[in-house]
Amino acid sequence: MNLKPILISILGLSISLETLSQIPENLKSELVILQVETLEEKTILLESRHFEAPNWSREGDYLLINAAGKLEKISLDGTHLGEVFPDLISRVNNDHGLSFDGKTLVFSRNDEGLSSRIYTIPIKGGKPKLITENYPSYWHGISPDGKTLVYCAERNGEWDIWAIPTKGGKEIRLTEEPGLDDGPEYSYDGKYIYFNSHRTGRMQVYRMKADGSEQEQLTFDNLDNWFPHPSPDNNSIVYISYLEDQKGAHPFGKDVKLRLMDLNTRNIKDLTQVFYGGQGTINVHSWSPDGKWIAFVRYHR
């Protein structure tokens, strides 16, 4: 079963057929930052349009979101700082982010007539470079040394975690279990890759060594747990939980909440109450550089 959404392009904009059918006409998107210790929330942006998947800049001075196939910079006071490489980047989906040194932007683009493939571009300027010839490939993580990308890809009917040199080259399969493996992201020390997997029949959070060995399940509940993002101090992960079984999918417009796991004790706490979200809420890394805040998108009907 193809568990990643089928994507179409409309006037150069990328959106999944499933998400397109789920977005209400009166939708509002709210860009929020949350203090993980106090649970204080600040609304950065609230607009009557659909945007997704915030990243925090490595300097901490702006947030990066995708909307209508483009990438936009938003300051922490809600000011629109413009599109990122508007003449070079289009058809972007919600899998994008920055290298640890902040010098490289990585993004997944739904190429016309094809499916998602992964590109890089120097943040100071240049031309996008295609990294994955094969498709579909959905980027999620880059190693701390900047040398390796990890991503979810479908090859021969199986959705697994793959790795590839950031400069391009041979891709390496890291997982081989039945069912969808998705959302791979490196810890800040580079020792682990965190990901989510449907291998047990319910989506749960896992981690493995950077070479794919020692795969370990971390969550064991009746929620559907997606997109683990390790903190800068390597002590915790934040992830999104669907309250109901989504059968291996991560749809838009469902009851969800954000949760935090202490990796030393394995204790889990809720960071938010239940809200309307899912696809687009926190698909990619969104920790602030100091590890005190996370960014996410809450939707309103």
In which residue ranges do the predicted regions lie?
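Asp-box/WD-like beta-propeller blade repeats and closely related beta-sheet repeat scaffolds
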Residues: 90-95, 99, 103, 109-144
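Conserved beta-strand position repeated across blades of beta-propeller domains
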Residues: 55, 97, 141-143, 185, ...
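Residue-level detector of Asp-centered blade-edge/turn motifs that repeat once per structural unit
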Residues: 58-59, 100-101, 144-145, 188-189, ...
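Multi-bladed beta-propeller domains
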Residues: 33-50, 75-92, 121-136, 164-180, ...
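Beta-strand C-termini and the immediately following turn/loop, strongest in propeller blades
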Residues: 22-25, 44-45, 58, 63-69, ...
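Structural motif
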Residues: 28-30, 71-72, 114-119, 158-162, ...
